[in-house]
Amino acid sequence: MKPLRYTASALALGLALMANAQAVTTIPFWHSMEGELGKEVDSLAQRFNAENPDYKIVPTYKGNYEQNLSAGIAAFRTGNAPAILQVYEVGTATMMASKAIKPVYDVFKEAGIQFDESQFVPTVSGYYSDSKTGHLLSQPFNSSTPVLYYNKDAFKKAGLDPKQPPKTWQDLADYAAKLKASGMKCGYASGWQGWIQLENFSAWNGLPFASKNNGFDGTDAVLEFNKPEQVKHIAMLEEMNKKGDFSYVGRKDESTEKFYNGDCAMTTASSGSLANIREYAKFNYGVGMMPYDADAKDAPQNAIIGGASLWVMQGKDKETYTGVAKFLDFLAKPENAAEWHQKTGYLPITKAAYDLTREQGFYEKNPGADIATRQMLNKPPLPFTKGLRLGNMPQIRVIVDEELESVWTGKKTPQQALDTAVERGNQLLRRFEKSTKS
């Protein structure tokens, strides 16, 4: 009988352990962070899980921003959505209209966890807030602005001052020509051409991208990025391309790899590219502000954010939402938000994270690491430079890419391409406007 008692005790212990394991609430988190950024996401999740054994955040890379958004919406329609979905900033209007989301302020309220929305940097939180209530719909996570990365060693070889990156686009054109002449394969390349060369070019130089304050004041907005200032800028890049000083290398972040492998001497790319540049560049590099148009009045103005936020999906149980609230609260804590900012190059999303980073001496030890934040806070945003809230914006970006590519290949003039992009984009805006009223 004694062995039987031991067997029964072991069985009871095993069942207890199984019950305990089953009590852990699994929280799927779909994201678009790859490479070093993906490793940092995994690290955050592992730390949260260790501190909160009743919950398990499971991060899963689901492809680039467009692919992740499509996968998330498709999964929601079949009842298989993740609890947390990372969506890039131009997907905000789409998510708001999708009826697939649970506003983060509701998630925190129902979980009984205090949520101070004022802790977030206003120019970031304003992008993801309900225009009517002012409450956050999603939680800022990896916000960025475009910055200029430049190869200091290549600058020296070309006779340029490695401490003085170009301040204006006119300067950049001159620098690119000298760098190409010195033997570089590529003087300048740009990542995310629509976001940088039109969306941020417009804001940085105090120009609207669309009417209705870039869509914040209504879904009946129309695109306005085919004005003389934007046309002149694209024409300058076209001329650089003809001379071989500007190289078009892709629609997304391809220019970052071209930079850190030494092919391109300069690139404008996301501040969030810093993690990979820091990891892979084998030369001295610097970080500068986005160039501005020397002819623009009162430029530079302020940069608008890129990157993404975290959306909570509908259809989950109470315990899952409590775990989600705890995880989002964990991410916003000063020490965690500051570490994410410092390791990745993304903006400090809270004031406390910025203050902590400064107090730790990070900016003194890493010159240029505060460039993205300084650009965002350069001047108080104008009504039409605080961001974009345009329906079908992901598809509009594809149109912009197609039309800009027609310029780089010589098929269209800058004016023709931007006029066509505006016309095609407005058709998508009207389609979105109609869908929100039906």
Swiss-Prot record:
Short name of any one Pfam family annotated for the protein: SBP_bac_8
GO biological process entries: transmembrane transport
InterPro entries (UniProt xref): Bact_solute-bd_prot1, SBP, SBP_1_CS
Main location: periplasm
Location(s), subcellular: Periplasm
One GO location term (cellular component): outer membrane-bounded periplasmic space
SUPFAM superfamilies reported for this sequence: Periplasmic binding protein-like II
Signal peptide range: 1-23
Alphabetical keyword list: Periplasm, Signal, Transport
Residues reported to bind sn-glycerol 3-phosphate: 65, 89, 144, 270, 307, 346, 397
Function recorded in the entry: Part of the ABC transporter complex UgpBAEC involved in sn-glycerol-3-phosphate (G3P) import. Binds G3P.
Subunit note: The complex is composed of two ATP-binding proteins (UgpC), two transmembrane proteins (UgpA and UgpE) and a solute-binding protein (UgpB).
Protein family: Belongs to the bacterial solute-binding protein 1 family.
Name under which the protein is recorded: sn-glycerol-3-phosphate-binding periplasmic protein UgpB
